[in-house]
């Protein structure tokens, strides 16, 4: 089964109550929030009404909230290869005795 992955890109501040009610019916309340909707004509019509505010893609399966957050996160720019915990323990033992 396919799903629409809908992400709210722009805020509904200052827009008509009709647009805000459509966003509410799609369960989009905050910017950059993501919802998954079934692919059907009703949801397609709702998305079409707010097409200027959202980004839409079709996916095969829903992602969990944690997976969604990880996919949006940027890389840190470095990787930790080794931690120097054993050396610190030895230093602490030397100063304690």
From Swiss-Prot:
GO biological process: mitochondrial translation
Entry-linked InterPro entries: Ribo_uL30_ferredoxin-like_sf, Ribosomal_uL30_bac-type, Ribosomal_uL30_ferredoxin-like
Disulfide bonds: none
Keywords, ordered alphabetically: Mitochondrion, Ribonucleoprotein, Ribosomal protein
The organism's place on the tree of life at top rank: Eukaryota
GO cellular component: mitochondrial large ribosomal subunit; mitochondrion
Cellular location(s): Mitochondrion
A GO molecular-function annotation: structural constituent of ribosome
SUPFAM superfamilies noted in UniProt: Ribosomal protein L30p/L7e
Family: Belongs to the universal ribosomal protein uL30 family.
Role this protein plays: Component of the mitochondrial ribosome (mitoribosome), a dedicated translation machinery responsible for the synthesis of mitochondrial genome-encoded proteins, including at least some of the essential transmembrane subunits of the mitochondrial respiratory chain. The mitoribosomes are attached to the mitochondrial inner membrane and translation products are cotranslationally integrated into the membrane.
Subunit relationships: Component of the mitochondrial large ribosomal subunit (mt-LSU). Mature yeast 74S mitochondrial ribosomes consist of a small (37S) and a large (54S) subunit. The 37S small subunit contains a 15S ribosomal RNA (15S mt-rRNA) and at least 32 different proteins. The 54S large subunit contains a 21S rRNA (21S mt-rRNA) and at least 45 different proteins.
Protein name: Large ribosomal subunit protein uL30m
């Amino acid at each position: 089964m396919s799903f629409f992955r809908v992400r709210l890109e722009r805020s509904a501040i200052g827009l008509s109550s009709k647009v805000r009610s459509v966003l509410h019916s799609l369960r989009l309340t905050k910017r950059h929030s993501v919802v998954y909707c079934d692919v059907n004509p009703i949801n397609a019509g709702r998305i079409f009404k707010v097409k200027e505010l959202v980004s839409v893609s079709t996916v095969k399966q829903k992602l969990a909230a944690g997976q969604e957050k990880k996919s949006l996160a940027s890389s840190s720019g470095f990787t930790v290869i080794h931690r120097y915990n054993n050396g610190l323990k030895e230093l602490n033992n030397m100063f304690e005795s």
